[in-house]
Amino acid sequence: MWITQEITPYLRKEYTIEAKLLDVRSEHNILEIFKSKDFGEIAMLNRQLLFKNFLHIESELLAHMGGCTKKELREVLIVDGFDLELAHQLFKYDTRIDFVQADEKILDSFISFFPHFHEVKNNKNFTHAKQLLDLDIKKYDLILCLQEPDIHKIDGLKRMLKEDGVFISVAKHPLLEHVSMQNALKNLGDFFPITIPFVAPLRILSNKGYIYASFKTHPLKDLMTPKIEALKSVRYYNEDIHRAAFALPKNLQEVFKDNIKS
């Protein structure tokens, strides 16, 4: 049996699977989990794939991209996603996490897929809310948006950031869909003086790119090497990965030269 991942409308990958382990459907989401000989379990969420053996790549990169460029990481907001492994990584800092996800049925269906599901959900500093309005009014050091936000969402979320806060959002991969990345950079650039694209180096099973945005904090100039060296139990993230994430080939430097703000 095979499952297909759509990388772009014109590019697809196929993966061999042995069996379907789970099929859960809610009003807005479809989650299927498969067993694979080469990749362990594979979750397909709305046609996007998550590989259980490689969950740590994105969660470590996004968590420590924010955590190692901020002196303090006290308040974190995660919206528009299901990745509890991201919260697990963020708990390496002395932080409180607000996790906004309305679809409890799908979230709870990841119980055997996310290795630290129970540990995160039971952490006293973790708050799961169905919507932003359910949270106390506060300012955040780091906001992670796990789907590409429109300008209205950007406008609302940036008002929730502290003056030196960091906003990280998912975007299209700059190499595969550079026009979409340009548009995402432009949207964020209307609100932030620092907007820089990045990817996960050596991650070959993803079609994602990301954008680091801030009013004051710079992802390279403000990188704190001692914080990176102090991290324990990480398998992917280090200083080399952090810096390489922002490297662009010559042609993309030219493409994005009017959109990157640093």
From Swiss-Prot:
The keyword Cell inner membrane does not apply. The active site is at D155 (proton acceptor). Spermidine binds at D83. Pfam families: Spermine_synt_N (PF17284), Spermine_synth (PF01564). It is an enzyme of class 2 (transferase). One of its GO terms (cellular component) is cytosol. SUPFAM superfamilies: S-adenosyl-L-methionine-dependent methyltransferases. Pathway: Amine and polyamine biosynthesis; spermidine biosynthesis; spermidine from putrescine: step 1/1. Homodimer or homotetramer. This is Polyamine aminopropyltransferase. It comes from Helicobacter pylori (strain J99 / ATCC 700824) (Campylobacter pylori J99). The lineage of its organism: Bacteria, Pseudomonadati, Campylobacterota, Epsilonproteobacteria, Campylobacterales. The gene is speE.
